[in-house]
Regions:
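Short, surface-exposed "cap/lid" segments of acyl-processing enzymes
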Residues: 11-75, 79-86
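Cap/lid segment of the alpha/beta-hydrolase catalytic domain
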Residues: 81-100
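Catalytic histidine-centered segment of alpha/beta-hydrolase-like enzymes
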Residues: 88-89, 229-239
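Alpha/beta-hydrolase fold nucleophile elbow
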Residues: 114-124
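Glycine-rich nucleophile elbow surrounding the catalytic serine of serine-hydrolase chemistry
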Residues: 122-134
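Active-site nucleophile loop of the alpha/beta-hydrolase fold
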Residues: 144-155
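The feature captures the conserved acid-bearing segment of alpha/beta-hydrolase catalytic domains
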Residues: 161-224, 230-232, 241-248
Length: 249
């Protein structure tokens, strides 16, 4: 990154994220106690749901609340939490030191499960992971909510995304040649035909910019909501009774 790139560029929007008692209470709970990997497997299940937590270790809400709201308590599922807050580029304890090691672990878990349907699901940073691993493994479909689609310094600067600066800066300080920092490029190279859903709220223009990066992929459907609660879209979908419908797709 050049010296000029370190100077934050004014954001191309004036949207504000408004916290409320309803959509922000869960943030006060300590999700740091959640393990990096939590499994709840059902023998003989045909569908395996792979969940990837965001920066605060959630899926737009606490994992169990998401499962309950989405009516998937009886499904086989594995939840992953990136304790390094590095968009899953630095691996997971006991698994390996990069995203590719996580990919190998996921492949083994999918094979062992015997599942015929696999879904990669995530919110925000977790949505980035869901798209990344779905393309990496060439299996299943991704269902994502307000995902980032790039974390490379050049594109963040050009498009005016200065969110999560401390976490992104720490990652940029140790980038390697094998890191996956631009999903448009990654999907184009690995699996341009992959199937995915991207759900995004028009109340957060930066999230919209990220979603728009994936325009042009024939099997990636971008669902834009005029309202949707901004970056808290998952909770808005839950309250609207839509979350369970989406997870059944």
């Amino acid at each position: 990154m050049t010296a000029s790139e370190k100077i934050p560029k004014p954001l191309p929007h004036d949207a504000k994220r408004v916290a409320s008692a309803n959509n922000d209470a869960w943030r006060n709970q300590d999700v740091s106690q959640l393990p990096p990997i939590s499994e709840s497997l059902v023998p003989g299940a045909e569908k395996l749901l792979l969940f990837f937590g965001g920066l605060v270790g959630s899926i737009g809400m606490l994992p169990f609340e998401f499962y309950r709201s989405a009516q998937i308590l009886d499904h086989s599922k594995i939840f992953f939490r990136d304790i390094y807050q590095s968009w899953y580029q630095r691996g997971l304890p006991g698994i390996g030191r990069d995203a590719h090691a996580i990919g190998d672990y996921l492949q083994a878990k999918i094979d062992a499960s015997g599942a015929t349907e696999v879904r990669f699901i995530g919110n925000s940073m977790g949505g980035y992971a869901a798209l990344m691993f779905c393309a990496m493994l060439g299996r299943g479909k991704a269902i994502t909510f307000v995902p980032q689609t790039f974390i490379c310094p050049q594109k963040r600067f050009r498009l005016g995304d200065d969110r999560y600066q401390d976490k992104v800066h720490a990652l940029h300080q140790s980038l390697t040649a094998t890191d996956i920092v631009d999903l448009k490029r990654w999907i184009s190279e690995r699996r341009p035909e992959m199937e995915a859903q991207v759900h995004v709220s028009g109340e957060d223009p930066i999230d919209m910019l990220h979603a728009n990066e994936l325009e042009g992929f024939g099997n990636i459907a971008i669902h834009r909501y005029a309202q949707g609660g901004g970056h808290d879209l998952v909770q808005w979908l839950r309250d609207a009774g839509e979350l369970a419908k989406i997870l059944k797709a």
